[in-house]
Amino acid sequence: MSLTSRSLLATMISLALYGPAMANENNKLSEDVNDELALTSDNADEIELVRGVCIAPQDRSTDPNNDPIKVTADHAEALDKTKVTYTGDVVVQQGNRTIAADQAYLRQPENIVVAEGNVYFHDGTIEVDSERLQSDLDTEDSEMDHAVYNLTCEPGRGEARRITKTHAQGTQFYRMKDGTYTTCPAEDNSWRFSATTLEREGDSPFANLYNARFEVLDVPVFYLPYLRVPVGKERLTGFLYPSVSYGSRDGFEFETPFYWNIAPNYDLTLTPKYMSNRGLQLNTDFRYLTEFGQGSLKGEYLASDKAADNNDSRWAFNYSHNGTYKSNWLFDVDYSKTSDFNYFTDIDSSIGNREDNNLLQTAEVSYREQYWDSTLRVRDFQPLTETGQGSQYRLMPQLEFNYYRPNLPYELDFSMASSISSFANDASNKPDATRVHLEPTLTLPFATPWWSLTSEAKLLYTYYNQDLKSYSRDGIEETVSRTIPTARIHSGLYLERDTSIWGQDYTQSLEPQIQYLYVQDKDQSGIYNPVNDDGGGYDSTRLQQDYYGLFSDKTYSSVDYVAPANQFTVGASTRYFDGNFKERFTLSLGQIFYIDKPTVDDEVESYSATALETEFNYADWLFFKSSMQYDASDKEVQIANGAIEYRENGVYIQPNYRYVSSSYLDKYVTNPNSVNDDGDQDGISQLGLSTGFPLNGGLSVRADYFHDLNVNKMVEGQVGLTYRSACWLIGLTYNKYASSSLGSSNTEYDNNVSLTFSLLGLQGAKPFGASSDTSNAMSYGNSFSLNN
């Protein structure tokens, strides 16, 4: 029989009032019911359609209480006005709610519905199989006995002697007596929580467990009188999973993070970390999100380092913020500081790395309008050197003003970049300076789908007021100004054709381009700069001339030295796109030809090094990327790097290599602080290998290895073994890295072993291969761009 009405209560009452009269009139109720059921679908099929389906509250278009009711059964009987009984494959459906049972009846006037025998209940977020269900139609309170439940919108299942669902002030509460909870799949009891009482309020991400036991393979591991566990995907207050490791530097390590979800837009993570060789450290990470942007405050404090001289306290902190206000104002802050220069060498940190030479301390505020913007910036560094002095200049402050005016008469675009900067350094042998820079630019762009031509003229005016202190050099001046005109003409073509390779159709593009650049040669010896002064320049370093850098209009990152130019740059790129217009191969080649030939190290150069870049993606499982700069004059490769990777079915292997010649470092790396004592004076030649692959039965392994070929020593290596089941994960990692100079005869290494464990479903686990299990700086990285 199929009945439809606006409420289950109305349906039951109508049967209670009129059912007896119907039965007395013709005594054919059972027969009529069976006849009508012949027009409906099989009840078992209806249950299978909803079993395991998630219908989240936000996905429901209407209030289920206002939806019509559909009741199907083999037989319905109303003996009097106090009880109506349904028997045989009873199914009651209302919106997202479904109840199925062998038998169901209504008791009046209490408005109590009772379902018995193979009871199934589904309300969109939870499904329950039980022996008996009792529900109050007035309050929607329910009880289910000897129940097995499954959460349909999030991981979680279990069983209970009784499940009670109650309502109070619009909120529903679930309570389980003698219940269990796990995120493992059915028939898998790798782990579970058991408790005499489990409680959950509505859609709360927590479950409260009383007299709780944690069991592994049905064996109790620990007992707690009260435990609160996360059962949803929301950010949750509570202890996160601990980590255990052992290293030759810090000894035994144990840390237990505690996460505090203060508010929807504030949270705090407190991590006590015990190191047997050093002591107890407290790490904090506070994050916030406001109308002015987002930021974080990180702190690390070790009260008494047993491995340090005099048991000194050691610390580090970082504050970062970026955001906007009313769409015009932009804010950016990044400030870090530490107690001593060896902090990141001695202690693993989320604030800095052991390779860092400086800690950045910067803040800026910007205001933007349609045609102009302005930025006030301050920047400092904490040198991580024994003397506390470094080569970097403080910017205290810098004021930038930029003006843009496109679409002037004759299709011209105009812009004006300007700045006033104050540079300071504590070293007595380095000058300080105030610099004023103006850079008006006129641009005439022209473009079609296949051709472009851009002409540009600039005037670079710079004024310096330099405090030389004890620094001296012939020609350097305290006050100096410089005006340099520049001109640039850049043109490019875009051509394409259909082609076929090995029976596969492709679209090939050919993109040649040519540029003429003129920068007037001016005497700049009066300025402290990277050409006339070894390691000089306030904020200028030489840019790397890769393929795209060849077409830049400047050689240095800033204006302390403006390299003269009278030159042509010629280059071309070709790309191959498959039938889905997915880029599969690219090759770029370019070179600069000098009209006015520059002199470098007393050698006249007629052309620059040839820059080559290529990338290849074959069938989304084999990737290759490489770049090279080849100097034909010296017949040597200046810079080269490359990586090839096989990635398929959870397996990846990536050999990679990077190289910088010693002559390139001698010529162009003029900042002595950028060349460390790890053998870089002999150039850089480093080989790396990263790999990861699954083994049998949920086991997987990953490894990284990096080797310096110049000194024939390992830089860093690690290997990790991970076991992942459907509901838990455990990983063991060994890491070894050089903790002293590779150039020394007796390089020291630190060794670390770490163990991680995670219950999947209670807390998200990072995918295998996404990041390193240790704090090593060198690990697997996906540098390929043709994998879109």
Swiss-Prot record:
| Gene3D superfamilies to which the protein is assigned, alphabetical | Lipopolysaccharide (LPS) transport protein A like domain
Cross-referenced InterPro entries: LipoPS_assembly_LptD, LptD, LptD_C, OstA-like_N
**Membrane-traversing stretches:** none
Is Repressor among the key words of this record?
no
The record's annotation in Pfam families points to: LptD, LptD_N
Task: Provide the protein's localization.
Answer: Cell outer membrane
In the UniProt record, the signal sequence range is 1-23
Q: Which keywords are on file for this protein?
A: Cell outer membrane, Membrane, Signal
Where mainly found? Answer: membrane
Mention any one GO cellular component term assigned to this protein in its UniProt record.
cell outer membrane
Name the Gene Ontology biological process terms. Gram-negative-bacterium-type cell outer membrane assembly; lipopolysaccharide transport
The lineage's top-level taxon is: Bacteria
What does the function comment of this entry state?
Together with LptE, is involved in the assembly of lipopolysaccharide (LPS) at the surface of the outer membrane.
Q: HAMAP family annotated for this entry? A: LPS_assembly_LptD
**What family classification does the UniProt entry report for this protein?**
Belongs to the LptD family.
What interactions and quaternary structure are annotated?
Component of the lipopolysaccharide transport and assembly complex. Interacts with LptE and LptA.
UniProt name for this protein: LPS-assembly protein LptD
Q: Which organism is it from?
A: Photobacterium profundum (strain SS9)
